[in-house]
């Protein structure tokens, strides 16, 4: 039961953070491109990679992992918003922007996870 509670709390925090970061990023840009969702997905990918490397090194409990990876980062990043933004771009005839969104989200997300893992491992090496 505690794991479910941690998932709910983590998801609520992640969702609130996603709303704030996404809204702020989108307002900062003057283009129709969905920078808000792209930014939370890239930031979240980096953070999940970073936290995963720390969780592996320090054997985080199943409850802590549930809070972080399923709750917090699951609430912060979102595939459904990415898909909706892409479909809206396609429906309005902005096919190049839609393709750019798909490529940027996937490529930058993978790079961000990779960099997060490397940073986490380097920090752990420095600490030990």
From Swiss-Prot:
GO CC annotations, alphabetized: plasma membrane
Gene Ontology MF term list: fluoride channel activity; metal ion binding
GO biological process: cellular detoxification of fluoride
Activity modulation notes: Na(+) is not transported, but it plays an essential structural role and its presence is essential for fluoride channel function.
InterPro entries listed in its UniProt record: FluC (IPR003691)
Transmembrane segments: 4-24, 35-55, 67-87, 99-119
Catalytic activity of the protein: fluoride(in) = fluoride(out)
Chain residues that bind Na(+): 74, 77
Assigned keywords, A-Z: Cell inner membrane, Cell membrane, Ion channel, Ion transport, Membrane, Metal-binding, Sodium, Transmembrane, Transmembrane helix, Transport
Origin superkingdom: Bacteria
Compartments where found: Cell inner membrane
Membrane topology reported for the UniProt record: Multi-pass membrane protein
Summary of the function given for this chain in its UniProt record: Fluoride-specific ion channel. Important for reducing fluoride concentration in the cell, thus reducing its toxicity.
Family indicated by similarity: Belongs to the fluoride channel Fluc/FEX (TC 1.A.43) family.
Protein known as: Fluoride-specific ion channel FluC
Organism whose genome encodes this protein: Parabacteroides distasonis (strain ATCC 8503 / DSM 20701 / CIP 104284 / JCM 5825 / NCTC 11152)
Lineage: Bacteria, Pseudomonadati, Bacteroidota, Bacteroidia, Bacteroidales
